[in-house]
Swiss-Prot record:
The keyword Transmembrane helix applies. The keyword Lipid biosynthesis does not apply. Pfam families: BPD_transp_1 (PF00528), BPD_transp_1_N (PF19300). The complex is composed of two ATP-binding proteins (GsiA), two transmembrane proteins (GsiC and GsiD) and a solute-binding protein (GsiB). Residues 95-292 form the ABC transmembrane type-1 domain. Residues 30-98, 152-168, 250-278 are periplasmic. Residues 1-8, 120-130, 190-228, 300-306 are cytoplasmic. GO terms for cellular component: plasma membrane. It comes from Pectobacterium atrosepticum (strain SCRI 1043 / ATCC BAA-672) (Erwinia carotovora subsp. atroseptica). It is a multi-pass membrane protein. InterPro entries: BPD_transp_1_N, MetI-like, MetI-like_sf. This is Glutathione transport system permease protein GsiC. The chain crosses the membrane at residues 9-29, 99-119, 131-151, 169-189, 229-249, 279-299. PANTHER family: DIPEPTIDE TRANSPORT SYSTEM PERMEASE PROTEIN DPPB-RELATED (PTHR43163), GLUTATHIONE TRANSPORT SYSTEM PERMEASE PROTEIN GSIC (PTHR43163:SF5).
Length: 306
């Protein structure tokens, strides 16, 4: 298993190189002149040209990419064109709010989604199944920005129970985490139901029932572990999606996280911050997928890696 883990880590190198090239090209294809934005609206052509030279944007693209690559290999993500602070410092200030928002969203979404999926599978085609799948379809159909504004209007503006924006106390996490986790809970419910329906039809489940084992133990002890493998895969993908896909929710709730930083950086054409954030999100997805593969063996000891 250790050899498999090392091989997978080495396999990350070409993937990250490809991501670096694509990110660099994508960022430099964005419309707009970052030198003009950094210089300000009142700046004349001479000042803009000086800013362009200072930022290194007057160099050919291959030269800029080589500079970008060598800096990353040295652990230097560059300096923000807007704040003039190191990009690592900008990301460090925003990472924890996004991380904890993701954890809160994922926690309730997994618990609620798996519970609905298991209940829907056990009482397949019954009223619990219909109610559960209706909730799941509703969660997938409702856009995040619309759900966020609706929750904000009801619980913050009308009732005054919860704060509207910010991330100062645990109360600030409730509405954004509900908004961000709604679609994930819906996906988890549908995926868990599909996986459990297949498991409930297996021979070992019928054998356990024939031996007189209680239905709750049959479902939770024999069914849950075998149904978890595809569910864990989806869980890992959804966690990566939440960590890198909270842009809309962070913008709606004015959340001081990575998503809002990325939106602001795109608006200001802050190349170093955009490149660093997209690379960070890509690395997160890759590492989460690797972690999911490692969890397979813990869930099902029959799985071995070579």
């Amino acid at each position: 298993m250790l050899n498999y883990f090392i091989k997978r880590l080495l396999g990350l190198i070409p993937t990250l190189l490809i991501v670096m090239v694509l990110v660099f090209l994508f960022v430099h294809l964005l419309p707009g002149d970052p030198a003009r934005l950094a210089a300000g609206r009142e700046a004349d052509a001479a000042v803009i040209e000086m800013v362009r030279q200072d930022l290194g944007l007057d160099k050919p693209l291959p030269h800029q990419f080589w500079h970008f690559l060598t800096n990353i290999l040295q652990g230097d993500l560059g300096t923000s064109m807007v704040s003039k602070r190191p990009v690592t410092q900008e990301i460090a200030l925003r990472f924890m709010p996004t991380f904890w928002l993701t954890v809160c969203s994922m926690a309730w979404a997994v618990i609620f989604g798996m519970a609905i999926g298991i209940v829907s599978a056990v009482w397949r085609n019954g009223w619990p199944d219909r109610i559960g799948m209706t909730l799941a379809v509703s969660g997938l159909s409702f856009p995040a920005f619309a759900l966020g504004m609706l929750l904000m209007q009801i619980f913050s503006v009308e009732l005054g129970w919860l704060p509207t924006v910010g991330a100062d106390t645990w109360l600030h996490y409730i509405l954004p985490s509900l908004t961000l986790g709604a679609a994930v809970a819906a996906v988890m419910a549908r995926f868990t139901r599909a996986s459990f329906v297949d498991v409930l039809q297996e021979d070992y489940m019928r054998t356990a029932r024939a031996k007189g084992v209680r239905e709750s133990l049959v479902v939770l002890k024999h069914g849950l572990r075998n149904a978890l493998i595809p569910v864990v895969t989806m869980m890992g993908l959804q966690f990566g999606f939440l960590l890198g896909g909270s842009i809309v929710v962070e913008k709606v709730f004015n959340w001081p996280g990575l998503g809002r930083l990325l939106v602001d950086s795109v608006e200001m054409r802050d190349y170093p911050v955009i490149q660093a954030e997209v690379l960070l999100f890509s690395l997160e997805f890759i590492l989460i997928n690797l972690l999911v593969d490692m969890l397979y063996a813990a869930i099902n000891p029959a799985i071995r890696y070579k």
